[in-house]
Amino acid sequence: MLHCITTIFLSISRMTMEDGPIAESYFTAYADVCFREFGNHVKFWTTINEANVFTIGGYNDGTSPPGRCSNCSSGNSSTETYIVGHNLLLAHASVSRLYQQKYKDKQGGSVGFSLYAFEFIPQTSSSKDDEIAIQRAKDFFYGWILGPLTFGDYPDEMKRAVGSRLPIFSKEESEQVKGSSDFIGIMHYFPALVENIKLKPSLSRNTDFYSDMGVSLTYLGNFSGFGYDVFPWAMESVLEYIKQTYGNPPVYILENGTPMKPDLELQQKDTRRIEYLQAYIGAVLKAVRNGSDTRGYFV
């Protein structure tokens, strides 16, 4: 039987996710329509697509909708990134609660949450500072989302670094968010080199997600648009980290793959992508054999 996973929220430019309660109520009402109209055909739902990089791109960097950042015409990278991430988690919990109460028994589906998953490796293999920085990067990219979904709160390191700019879950909100995702969806393409950075006091006021994290990232791979480099070990490592750190939740790989140069002969043979998929599916198989509860792979 063929199953599909349907994403409710892909990218919304007009819905201001920095306005928490209003956006949460609208999003829940929108999800209600989706469940009612399509729930008999869709058994796997993801509420938010790539929640971490969506928020960073839209509210820290300003490179994706709605294009807000400190250096943009409007926005504040030091606060809005965390406010929006917080509101996305609360909106997800509201939608998950709606499904559990109104549709779960009748439709028998599942509601999950997705994030972009990098594998992080040290810029300098002998650098202890870079090794420590890797954990900070994981706390910010993974723990920011999976911490509340698994434990009901943000990682301690993130709370220390961001301070009062990081929203606080009430006891009720923490209980609602914790355990609200039936599965975790991940998007993965390539790893990143991590270098520890120390900001000079004179620059410390220009805070954003990356300066709070205290790392510089260099993405590995060929980004020409005609094929990504192959790092299957990175996929295996990501799945192992999620297994060990967040209680081995059910995982679906929702995005992976590589583009191809528009060449008819290459497209007919497609050898590169066959080899790519063999390598990555093999890495997923290794992770599953090592205990990862990975249940699906999409390209």
UniProtKB/Swiss-Prot annotation:
The keyword Chloroplast does not apply. Residues 1-16 form the signal peptide. The gene is BGLU2. Glycans are attached at N71, N76, N222, N290. This is Putative beta-glucosidase 2. SUPFAM superfamilies: (Trans)glycosidases. Belongs to the glycosyl hydrolase 1 family. Its EC number is 3.2.1.21.
